[in-house]
Amino acid sequence: MAKKSLIQREKKRQKLEQKYHLIRRSSKKEISKIPSLSGKWEIHGKLQSLPRNSAATRLHRRCFSTGRPRANYRDFGLSGHILREMVHACLLPGATRSSW
């Protein structure tokens, strides 16, 4: 189980990303449209003034049940070992154990 503080930090990052998403996207579009270098530097400065944690690259997917940050499957939102346990217990519909 991940520390609760790390999970809360990730939730805070998600809120910041949602809050500044439109500002960030519009600034990036403006940079591509402006031909002058000085104008690009000005808009780049605005981007730099936004909070660091509001960037989408700072977000990290976590396991829904344990909060584990590694080996997550997007389809289920679970980490690998929890996914395996749930499939073995027949708790995930449509997921079957592989056999060959």
From Swiss-Prot:
UniProt-listed Pfam families: Ribosomal_S14 (PF00253)
InterPro entries hit by this protein: Ribosomal_uS14 (IPR001209), Ribosomal_uS14_bac/plastid (IPR023036), Ribosomal_uS14_CS (IPR018271)
GO molecular function, one term: rRNA binding
Protein family: Belongs to the universal ribosomal protein uS14 family.
Native species: Platanus occidentalis
One GO CC term, this protein: chloroplast
Alphabetic keyword roster: Chloroplast, Plastid, Ribonucleoprotein, Ribosomal protein, RNA-binding, rRNA-binding
Keyword Ribosomal protein: yes
Protein name: Small ribosomal subunit protein uS14c
Protein origin, superkingdom: Eukaryota
Database matches in NCBIfam families: PRK08881.1 (NF006477)
Subunit structure: Part of the 30S ribosomal subunit.
One BP annotation, GO: translation
Intracellular or extracellular location(s): Plastid, Chloroplast
Annotated function: Binds 16S rRNA, required for the assembly of 30S particles.
Membrane-spanning residues: none
Higher taxonomy: Eukaryota, Viridiplantae, Streptophyta, Embryophyta, Tracheophyta
